[in-house]
């Protein structure tokens, strides 16, 4: 399995608009996990594989940078 497939990475600089999961939660492939707000638009980030959410440290309203890892799925 490719390591990049495990990570949910911010595609753009912005802020966390919504977090739909928590650490330890099991998610399905293509399930929405986080929404980022940037340039007055919301961007939906989805799980690239099924598994358990780990490493979620952000909360709603946090500023994030493009390329930042938001969470991983194991």
What are these regions (language model features)?
Residues 11-12, 17-22, 26, 55-58:
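Short histidine-centered loop motifs in beta-beta connectors
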Residues 24-33, 61-70:
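A structural signal for short beta-strand/turn segments enriched in small hydrophobics and glycine
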Residues 1-15, 32-48:
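Short beta-strand-turn/beta-hairpin segments enriched in glycine/proline and small hydrophobics
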Residues 73-74:
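Short C-terminal tail/terminal secondary-structure segment
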């Amino acid at each position: 399995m490719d390591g990049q497939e495990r990570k949910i990475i911010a595609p753009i600089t912005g802020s966390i608009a919504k977090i739909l999961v928590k650490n330890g939660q099991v998610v399905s492939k293509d399930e929405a996990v986080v929404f980022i707000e940037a340039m007055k638009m919301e961007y939906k980030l989805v799980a690239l594989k099924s598994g358990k959410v780990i490493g979620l440290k952000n909360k709603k309203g946090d500023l994030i940078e493009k390329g930042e890892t938001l969470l991983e799925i194991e």
